[in-house]
Amino acid sequence: MFLAALVFLFVLLMSLPFLVPHLGVLALFGFVPLLCMERVASMEGMKRVWIWHYSAFVLWNAVTTFWVCNATVGGGIFAVLANAFQMSIVFGLFRWSKKLLKGSLPYILLAMLWIAWEKYYLTAAQISWPWLVLGNSFATTVSLAQWYEFTGALGGSLWIWACNLGLFGLMVALSDGSWFRFNAKAKLAAAGGYLAIL
């Protein structure tokens, strides 16, 4: 039940920026519930976790791109399922990398793989599906994304991943007690670094 709540929180936080004007800031911590879900599942040794993250991506795609069904219902359903499958592959590679890499490296790899996938999808793929590029969540919050003229929407995707991973890292440090072993300078650097990203 807890994992389902995290999935629905992820869907809510990541859908609103694409549906409601001026809510792009929600994307800055929208992936945290999905990362928490993955952490809980890993700590519990759960099997078939892909069902949870694939379901999360299907729901997110369905909520934000439901309008494609106005053109063709079959095409809309296929687009939702196929795009969610691709997102799930990226997330699955991240989960697999956690078996090989330790510390923060799998999380950095997750951000890199996601942005590389978005870049491929925008430029080289036969089908372009730019609606759910993470950086596009600020499409109606232009005042926060003036620097997009230099980085494009993928720079926004990097910003979103940096914020999500930074917040998740702070939450993990607090929950496992490592935050309390940091000296004052390390705490100030961690909190200050996260605030600078915001």
PLM features: residue spans?
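Membrane-embedded alpha-helical bundles of multi-pass enzymes
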Residues: 1-198
